[in-house]
Every structure is written in structure tokens, then in C-alpha cells.
Curated annotation (Swiss-Prot):
The gene is prfA. Peptide chain release factor 1 directs the termination of translation in response to the peptide chain termination codons UAG and UAA. It comes from Phytoplasma australiense. It is found in: Cytoplasm. This is Peptide chain release factor 1. The keyword Protein biosynthesis applies.
Length: 354
């Protein structure tokens, strides 16, 4: 690993030298991209080397009995212990930075939320989750575009599909896929009984044109009257669009746009993501990571997370994390959950790499 770090350091220095040469704009852009990827590793490695030098010097002084003052000697020994611990921490951080990255992590995502088991209460919870994700996206300065929205009675949502754009979005939101279980007293419950219901969240990496090629001859396009916010033309013109990909059997519809052209573009974005996800799932199936294990059917027993409102408690069952701050997290503070999930994933990868 040390040799690999030195190679990365040398590559970083070479790229810096390349910037001084008479490069084209496109070359400079690529160099800056590569530098930005390597910079966190190089900076941390430099900290590690500096700390290692300090540790070597103090160890040498202690071994050669160069310190005669007893009080200074005790301080030096404590300093050595502190530096040794810091060295271990930096080394583990470097190991994490060198772990293979998920190639999807830097992508935008399609986020889908559906009410599942529990009727209208499930749909109300789906609306609450949408609000949480919108607030989280706002805190990260991500752009959110609604592709499809199907409201239900009393302010609930039967389903919603969003396109979320920004930096490294999939690396954060990929942990949200699965069954989310809620335990609370519905507003309509006169006897105060706690009801359990679920919503399904699905997070798909957005597919780019270079990653997936779709022949329009394989797509059937249907138009129908929109029930969305299309102004006066709603229900009078066929602005809503349904795209059906015949080879895969995947069909998507979009009606949130104000024109047929806009809805067709949004539907195609959604269709690409679903086809791309199907391709990814085919690969994962070979590794026993089929999509159903990720998302499930919505049954209460398949939950990845439980939201207990009476006790203000949220539990992520994948890592056994329980927090008594449900109210805060539902205001968009999802990093309280997502960061421990990222840490757990990194630790698992470290164990696998040993």
C-alpha cells in the first residue's frame, strides 16, 4: 500500500507539472479533474509522512536516552503514544480512500417513493418521506425535478418520482432503497391505537447516453390527457406521454410537464434509468444481489428502517443503529443516518480487502 501511495503522489506531481505546459483547454479540464480526485489522498498521505517523521525523531531521542529531565521524558513518552495513535488513524483513512469506488456514486438519481402496506396512512407517510428528501436535497444544494406525482386523499401520495441532480448524489441516497416502516397514531384514530404501515423507496442512478443506447424503433409512444398542472390545456390536449420499451417490457408515463415535448423528455430520462437499473440488476443477480433483495414487496417484515413516532425513535435495521431524534431527521437531517451507513460500508470493504 505504501508503494501505491508513493505512485499516486508522483502522479499528482506529474499532473501539476503538466499544467505548466502549453495545454489545450480540454486537456487542462481533464488534468484538473484528475488532480481533484488525487488531492485528498495526496494531502492525507503528506500528513501521514510528516507525522511518521515526528514519531521517528521522538522515538530516536527516547531510545538514545537524550532526554534527562524526568518531566520532559514523561511528556515525550505521552507524545509518542499520541503520535502512534494518530498514525493508525491516518493509515486507516488512507486505506478507505484507496478502496474501490462504486462507479455509480457520482451520478444523479431517480428517486421513487410509493405508499405500500397500510392504505391511506402509508400514502401519508410517503408524503412525509418526500418532504424529508426535499429538505435534505435543499441542504445539499441539489436540484430536484418532479417527473411524476400521484397524490391520494388527505394529502397523501400513492407515488412520486424525482430527478435529483448535483454532486455525488447516488453515494448518499443509494442507502435509502428499501422498505421504510412507520409506527404512529393516525389522525383519524379515535382510540389512540398505534398503526404500522410502510412505504417503498427506490433509488436509481441516472443513465447517460454514453452508458446505454436505446433505439427509438424499440419504443412505443402513447399520448393521453394529462391530469397534472398543465394549465388550461389539462384534459383537453394529449400532453401526457407514456413510453413503452418493447424488448424489456418497461413502461413509464409522465404528465407533470406543461407540454407533450417536455413530458416526453422526462419520460425518456425515467425510462433510461429503469432500463439501466435492469442491466445493473442482471449483474447483481449473479452476485446474489437481485433488485428484490434491495427493495422488497413492501411487506412490514422486509423493512430496512423503522420510524417510531410515539417514542421519537428511528432505527436502521441494517447496522443496528437507533437514534432518539426522529423529529430532527424528518426535517431533512438524514446525515445522522446516512453517514453511519457509509462508515459501516467502508469498514466492511476494509475487512474484505484484508
Amino acid at each position: 500500500m505504501l508503494a501505491r501511495l508513493k505512485k499516486i503522489q508522483q502522479k499528482y506531481q506529474n499532473l501539476q507539472q503538466d499544467l505548466l505546459q502549453n495545454q489545450s483547454i480540454s486537456n487542462k479540464i481533464n488534468i484538473f479533474k484528475n488532480l481533484s480526485k488525487l488531492e485528498p489522498i495526496v494531502e492525507l498521505f503528506q500528513q501521514y509522512l510528516t507525522l511518521e517523521e515526528q514519531l521517528t525523531n521522538i522515538t530516536k531521542a527516547l531510545n538514545q536516552d537524550q532526554i534527562e529531565d524526568k518531566e520532559i521524558l514523561e511528556l515525550a513518552q505521552k507524545e509518542k503514544e499520541t503520535l502512534s495513535q494518530q498514525k493508525k488513524v491516518l493509515w486507516n483513512q488512507l486505506r478507505i480512500l484507496l478502496l474501490p469506488q462504486d462507479p455509480e456514486d457520482q451520478k444523479n438519481v431517480i428517486l421513487e417513493i410509493k405508499g405500500a402496506v397500510g392504505g391511506n396512512e402509508a400514502n401519508l407517510f410517503a408524503a412525509d418521506l418526500l418532504r424529508t428528501y426535499m429538505k435534505y436535497a435543499e441542504s445539499k444544494k441539489w436540484k430536484v425535478e418532479i417527473l411524476n406525482l400521484h397524490p391520494s386523499i388527505k394529502g397523501g401520495l400513492s407515488s412520486v418520482e424525482l430527478l435529483i441532480s448535483g454532486q455525488n448524489i447516488y453515494s448518499f441516497l443509494k442507502y435509502e432503497s428499501g422498505v421504510h416502516r412507520v409506527q404512529r397514531v393516525p389522525a383519524t384514530e379515535v382510540q389512540g391505537r398505534i398503526h404500522t404501515s410502510t412505504a417503498i423507496v427506490l433509488v436509481l442512478p441516472e443513465a447517460k447516453e454514453v452508458e446505454i443506447k436505446i433505439d427509438w424503433n424499440d419504443i412505443r409512444t402513447d399520448t393521453f390527457n394529462s391530469s397534472g398542472p398543465g394549465g388550461q390545456s389539462v384534459n383537453t390536449t394529449k400532453s401526457a406521454v407514456r413510453l413503452s420499451h418493447l424488448p424489456s417490457g418497461i413502461s413509464v408515463a409522465c404528465q407533470e410537464g406543461k407540454s407533450q415535448h417536455e413530458n416526453k423528455e422526462k419520460a425518456f430520462t425515467l425510462l433510461k434509468a429503469r432500463i439501466y437499473n435492469q442491466i445493473l440488476n442482471a449483474k447483481q443477480e449473479a452476485e446474489n444481489k437481485h433488485r428484490k433483495s434491495l427493495v422488497g414487496t413492501g411487506d412490514r417484515s422486509e423493512k430496512i428502517r423503522t420510524y417510531n413516532y410515539p417514542q421519537n425513535r428511528i432505527t436502521d435495521h441494517r447496522i443496528g443503529l437507533t437514534l432518539q431524534k426522529l423529529d430532527i431527521i424528518m426535517e431533512g437531517k438524514l446525515d445522522f443516518i446516512i453517514e453511519p451507513l457509509i462508515d459501516a460500508t467502508q469498514k466492511e470493504k476494509l475487512v474484505q480487502s484484508e
